[in-house]
A protein has these predicted regions:
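N-terminal catalytic cores of NTP/NDP-binding nucleotidyl/phosphoryl-transfer enzymes
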Residues: 1-39, 135-149
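Divalent metal-coordination and catalytic microenvironments
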Residues: 7, 60, 181
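Generic structural "secondary-structure junction" signal
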Residues: 8, 39-41, 105, 117-120, ...
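Short, compositionally biased low-complexity segments
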Residues: 28-31, 60, 238-242
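Short connector loops at secondary-structure junctions
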Residues: 32-44, 166-172
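Short low-complexity, flexible loop/linker segments enriched in glycine and/or proline
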Residues: 43-46, 178
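Divalent-metal (Mg2+/Mn2+/Ca2+)-assisted nucleotide/phosphate chemistry catalytic cores
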Residues: 46-165
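Conserved nucleotide- and phosphate/pyrophosphate-binding catalytic cores
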Residues: 125, 143-242
């Protein structure tokens, strides 16, 4: 989904894509412009969404070299796509679709104000089959969509995709502030590391980060484990002798 500037949390699945390419996978990135439109991203402006798609293409090319791209606009124009959306919908229920709205970062009631939002989970499940992938990759917040795709597979007599979920980086603001799920989000600027932040700004944000003694729920250690170690392989910390 095109949604503005890239933050550190987005680098986690990008690094996983890079690993998969190195392992011999053919990785296709779905640049989900129509999904962004449904989810009111970038003001719902198609000029903004198209610019966001091009920005994402550039960012993935930098951090995940070797991946291929497909836009949702290209996918929805392919023969059989909307038939698959209807088949997925037919094999599910309104209750299930409502529960899956969380993949958009939305409350279950949001679909009552905008009917198109109920198409979103069915589209995301249909995307997996339209792209004919063996493995669907996404953050943990996308598990409802992947489970929907797997659950309808038996009814539609389709091969179940493998679902691979990457962890979400916690907000530097800590739990309970700004973001209800406590994940890194652009809605909390001080709790989010943008890839375009200067070293000075990154240092300032990290120096004020929520960093409890406990390992669980520590966003600084999350960055270490899920971002720095996979990206750098080894890290040396030099401390003055005391």
């Amino acid at each position: 989904e095109p949604s503005g500037l890239l933050h550190a949390g987005s680098l986690v699945p990008m690094l996983k894509c890079r690993e998969l390419v190195k392992a011999g996978f053919e990785v296709t990135i779905l640049l989900a412009d129509w999904h962004g439109y449904i989810n009111d991203k970038l003001g719902g402006s198609w000029d903004n969404l198209n610019a966001g798609v091009e920005y994402q293409r550039q960012m993935f090319s930098v951090f995940s070299p070797g991946v291929k791209f497909k836009t949702a606009s290209e996918l929805v124009d392919e023969e059989g796509y909307w038939e698959m959306v209807l088949r997925v919908s037919k094999a599910s229920s309104l209750k299930r679709m409502r529960r899956a709205l969380s993949i958009m970062g939305r409350d279950e009631s949001d679909g009552d104000k905008d009917m198109s939002k109920f198409f979103y989970p069915a589209m995301q499940a249909a995307d997996i089959y339209a792209l004919d992938v063996d493995l669907a990759l996404g953050g943990m917040d996308q598990r409802h969509a992947h489970m929907l795709a797997r659950d309808v597979a038996d009814k539609l007599k389709l091969r179940k995709p493998i679902a691979l979920h990457t962890p979400l980086l916690g907000s530097l603001s800590g739990p309970g502030r700004m973001d209800t799920d406590a994940k890194m989000s652009k809605s909390d600027p001080t709790g989010t590391l943008l890839v375009h932040d200067s070293k000075k700004i990154l240092t300032k944000k990290l120096s004020k980060a929520y960093c409890p003694l406990e390992r669980e729920g520590n966003p600084v250690l999350d960055i270490w484990q899920h971002l720095l170690e996979p990206a750098l392989a080894s890290i040396t910390i030099e401390r003055p002798e005391k």
